[in-house]
A protein has these predicted regions:
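ATP/Mg2+-dependent ligation/transfer catalytic cores
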Residues: 1-204, 226
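Generic recognition of stable, solvent-exposed alpha-helical segments in well-folded globular domains
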Residues: 7, 124, 128, 186, ...
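Short glycine/proline-enriched loop/turn "hinge" motifs that connect secondary-structure elements
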Residues: 100-107, 140-141, 205-209, 258, ...
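Short, hydrophobic beta-strand segments
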Residues: 109-116, 214-221, 267
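Core alpha/beta catalytic barrel or barrel-like domain that forms the active/cofactor pocket
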Residues: 141-152, 161-178, 198-218, 248-266, ...
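Accessory "access/gating" subregions that flank catalytic or transport cores
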Residues: 178-184, 188-202, 216-223, 234-250, ...
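Short, contiguous, pocket-lining structural segments
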Residues: 179-187, 204-210, 222-233, 237, ...
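Loop-rich catalytic cores of soluble enzymes, especially ATP-dependent carboxylate-amine ligases
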Residues: 217-223, 242-342
Length: 342
């Protein structure tokens, strides 16, 4: 039985029996896109596939450094969690169809979970939005693309160095280098194979401009699956590199001395029959596409909360940094905020 073909609780039980798994790893995506989770005994996990389980709601109230968010001009009654609530468990559902092999842990499958009834769960919110779109006869596909610096450092060594004078994986500026990805083909192939084994295959992988910079483009999928794959890639690529005594850094601008790093979201809309709404034989730029771009422009300020969520994000958003600083769009134009691909 293929773990990627599980559809219900009975399928999960049959699979766990077939691979003799006593424990399962479960993770939830928090509001910063970080996977938070734990090991679960198979008996508890199997019950959870049918009736859900409780998970501490603090993961939707603290930041990536486990500090509680402090929101100005917001009353306690408006906050989802905090000292005033006592940080209770909230009902969480296993996403059965998200099951994957975990290449780093034999016989311990990996599953995602979500808070379907709460408006603070990123995956739950996305599912809700996709459902509203489908009611209007629209489906969407997406793909994520990440750039990251790779260092020959460990979580301990970067702290000992006070996050300065870090050793880059490779020196100098050399985008799209065949030389470098051939010299270091073992590591590149480890990443390619990891992604293939976890069913988040890469469409492309290459060096980017900067010392030790790598760019990975994840293959297109339905938007909920694409979002899952994006989170999984960031987490498990870091696992791979740390096991190799290296660190991947996805910060927007870790140093003023080097280029910044981007995360690109590729998006498209289709009708319920799978026909593209962004291209027709009659129109080079259909109205649906133009309205889509216009909507992105209109709400760009609000989107910035998600696209540029940290102070560091704005160190990247400056002229000449290959990052958009206004709400422009263009056809095959990499200098704009929104690039229409033909």
């Amino acid at each position: 039985m293929n773990i990627r073909e599980l559809k219900n609780a009975n399928d999960v039980k049959m699979y766990l029996d077939s691979v003799n798994s006593h424990y399962v790893k479960v993770a939830i995506t928090d509001i910063d896109g970080v996977l938070r989770g734990k090991y679960m005994h198979r008996d508890k996990f199997l019950k959870a596939t049918e009736s859900g389980f409780g998970f501490c709601d603090v993961i939707f109230g603290w930041d990536s450094n486990d500090e509680l968010y402090e929101l100005r001009n917001v009353s306690e009654d408006e906050l989802f969690t905090g000292w005033h609530t006592g940080f209770p468990d909230v009902k969480t559902s296993i996403v059965v169809e998200s099951g994957r092999l975990n290449p780093f842990e034999e016989n311990i499958p990996f599953f995602l979970a979500e808070l379907s009834d709460e408006e603070v769960c990123p995956r739950g919110i996305l599912n809700k939005i996709l459902g509203l779109m489908e009611n209007e006869g629209i489906k969407s596909k997406s793909a994520f693309e990440y750039e990251f610096f790779l260092f020959d450092e460990t979580p301990h060594s970067v702290r000992e160095k006070k996050f300065s004078n870090l050793k880059n994986f490779t020196p100098g500026m050399y985008g799209y280098s065949i030389l470098r990805n051939s010299v270091h083909s073992d590591l590149y192939n480890k990443l390619l194979n990891l992604c293939a084994e976890m069913d988040l295959p890469l469409e492309g992988l290459h060096t980017e401009t900067g010392p030790g910079v790598i760019e990975a483009a994840i293959m297109v999928d339905h938007s909920i699956n694409a979002a899952d794959k994006a989170v999984l890639f960031k987490t498990f690529s870091k696992v791979l590199f740390q096991k190799n005594d290296q660190m991947a850094n996805f910060m927007a601008k870790w140093s003023d001395k080097y280029p910044g790093q981007s995360g690109h979201i590729h998006a498209s809309l289709q009708d319920l029959d799978g026909q593209s709404l962004f291209s027709t034989k009659e129109e080079a730029l259909p109205k649906t596409l133009l309205y889509f771009v216009g909507g992105l422009q209109k709400y760009m300020r609000e989107f910035a909360v998600m696209i540029a969520p940290t102070v560091n994000s704005y160190k990247r958003l400056c002229p000449g940094a290959w990052a958009p600083i206004n709400m422009t769009w263009g056809i095959e134009n990499r200098t704009t905020a929104f690039r229409v691909i033909q």
